[in-house]
Amino acid sequence: MNKTAKLIDHTLLKPGATEFEIKTLCAEALKYGFASVCVNPFWVKLAASELEGSDVKVCTVIGFPLGANTTEAKVFEAKNALENGAQELDMVINIGAVKSGLYELAYHDIKLIRDLGKNFVLKVILETTLLTDAEKIKVCELSACAEADFVKTSTGFAGGGATIEDVKLMKANISSGMQVKASGGVRDLETLTKMVEAGASRIGTSSSIKIIESL
């Protein structure tokens, strides 16, 4: 059970999440041994306090969910999150820049956050449902050049989620030290297993407990 739990970012990103729900999320992560909790930036400080001294990481999102912030805003948001206790950052690429062929801009979004340090895990969210396969490959290459740790399929807010095909494509187009996070629509053990078999080594889901208790 614990091995599967360690694949999961226990996620609560809905805008109406309450303090009680965040505390419950953290307690669940401690109980089941999830890799991290993934919360919105406002809740990072609380999550860090609740998880202090444990091996459950605090993950938050940057430029979420649209990715359309300026690079400067994303860098500030990332720096602020790290100061508040975040250990993993899931940042959304500038999707419009990628689709416009403005790859240098998209690269700098990632690189300037990476330049904040190597003491945190950086995951780059592609939002695969909005990209062509060629664009997905390009973002994987940019992420590798910027020394990101992961590429991630989706925010879960754009109408599409992780697919087996996308996970395989992403895995095939990242550097050997990088990993893939599948997120969006992973709600049961069968889907999680398929994502892992396709090459994902981290899963983002709000159905974590349902999955673990089905083992």
UniProtKB/Swiss-Prot annotation:
The principal localisation class reads cytoplasm
For biological process, the GO terms are: 2-deoxyribose 1-phosphate catabolic process; carbohydrate catabolic process; deoxyribonucleotide catabolic process
Q: Name one GO cellular component term.
A: cytoplasm
Give UniProt keywords alphabetically.
Answer: Cytoplasm, Lyase, Schiff base
Q: Where in the cell is it found?
A: Cytoplasm
What Gene3D superfamilies does UniProt report for this protein, alphabetically?
Aldolase class I (3.20.20.70)
Instruction: Give EC number(s), comma-separated.
Output: 4.1.2.4
Q: Which reaction does it catalyse?
A: 2-deoxy-D-ribose 5-phosphate = D-glyceraldehyde 3-phosphate + acetaldehyde
- SUPFAM superfamilies from the UniProt entry: Aldolase (SSF51569)
The active site of this protein is located at: D90, K152, K181
* Lyase listed as a keyword: yes
**Which pathway, metabolic or otherwise, does it act in?**
Carbohydrate degradation; 2-deoxy-D-ribose 1-phosphate degradation; D-glyceraldehyde 3-phosphate and acetaldehyde from 2-deoxy-alpha-D-ribose 1-phosphate: step 2/2
Q: Kindly list the GO molecular function terms attached to this UniProt entry.
A: deoxyribose-phosphate aldolase activity
Q: What class of enzyme is it?
A: lyase
Entry similarity comment? Belongs to the DeoC/FbaB aldolase family. DeoC type 1 subfamily.
Q: Which NCBIfam families does the entry link to? A: deoC
* Record's function text: Catalyzes a reversible aldol reaction between acetaldehyde and D-glyceraldehyde 3-phosphate to generate 2-deoxy-D-ribose 5-phosphate.
Can you say what this protein is called? Deoxyribose-phosphate aldolase
The organism of origin for this protein: Elusimicrobium minutum (strain Pei191)
